[in-house]
Each structure stands twice: as structure tokens, then as C-alpha cells.
């Protein structure tokens, strides 16, 4: 597993875990990964998360499925990456599927959804799209 872009690696682990119908996936923990996971849990895309270990922290992510065993996350895509950062002001924040999906944004007030960023009148770095 390449650690050139740890956020993209986390999103790939989530995507692959849902394709493999896993209940939980594990990724190395960091502050930004915990914040992104918290937003996805609040928006209902993931079931739960917890940080394991006291020396080397691991982020345990519980995946969420519909009753028909179909993953709740249909599409998850990394937008801003280390080689090409993508920043938008509050007026230019994109909408995913006309508001049906979520854009995760890293702002000066923390990691949040595009809807919350618009409400707080802040822009920031577009981390990923989730639908």
C-alpha cells in the first residue's frame, strides 16, 4: 500500500471493503482521517468508527449496507490530492448529484460537508465526493 496519499488510500480501503462485503475495515489513523470519517458517519454513509491501540493508532471503520446487502456508498472519489490541490470559495463549492451526494471540504473551521460550509460562509480544500 502506497502512502503517497494517505487519504486516497483510506477511501480505497473503504471502497474495496464494501465491494468485498466486509463489516469493518482498518486503516492507519491520523487527525484528518478521523475528521473525514466523522463527517461520513454523521451523513449516514458509514455506521461507526473507533480508534484502536495506544502506541500505533489504527482507525476501525464500520461499513454500512442497505437491507438488500448493497453498500450505502455508491461512489467515493478523491478530488484534491498532494500533486494538485483543489480549493473553492463559498460561492464555488460544487454539488454532487444536485445535492443528493456530499462534498467533504477542509476549511479553516474544520472538516465539514459542502452544505455546512455554505451555511458558515467558508470555502476550503475539496477533499472528496461521496454519493
Curated annotation (Swiss-Prot):
Name of the featured protein: Small ribosomal subunit protein uS8
Alphabetic keyword roster: Ribonucleoprotein, Ribosomal protein, RNA-binding, rRNA-binding
Pfam families in the cross-refs: Ribosomal_S8 (PF00410)
Lineage of the organism: Bacteria, Pseudomonadati, Pseudomonadota, Gammaproteobacteria, Enterobacterales
Functional summary from the UniProt entry: One of the primary rRNA binding proteins, it binds directly to 16S rRNA central domain where it helps coordinate assembly of the platform of the 30S subunit.
InterPro entries: Ribosomal_uS8, Ribosomal_uS8_CS, Ribosomal_uS8_sf
The family this protein is said to belong to: Belongs to the universal ribosomal protein uS8 family.
Subunit structure: Part of the 30S ribosomal subunit. Contacts proteins S5 and S12.
GO biological process, any: translation
Cellular compartments per GO CC: ribonucleoprotein complex; ribosome
Stored HAMAP family: Ribosomal_uS8_B (MF_01302_B)
PANTHER family, alphabetized: 40S RIBOSOMAL PROTEIN S15A
Gene: rpsH
Keyword field contains S-adenosyl-L-methionine: no
GO molecular function, one term: structural constituent of ribosome
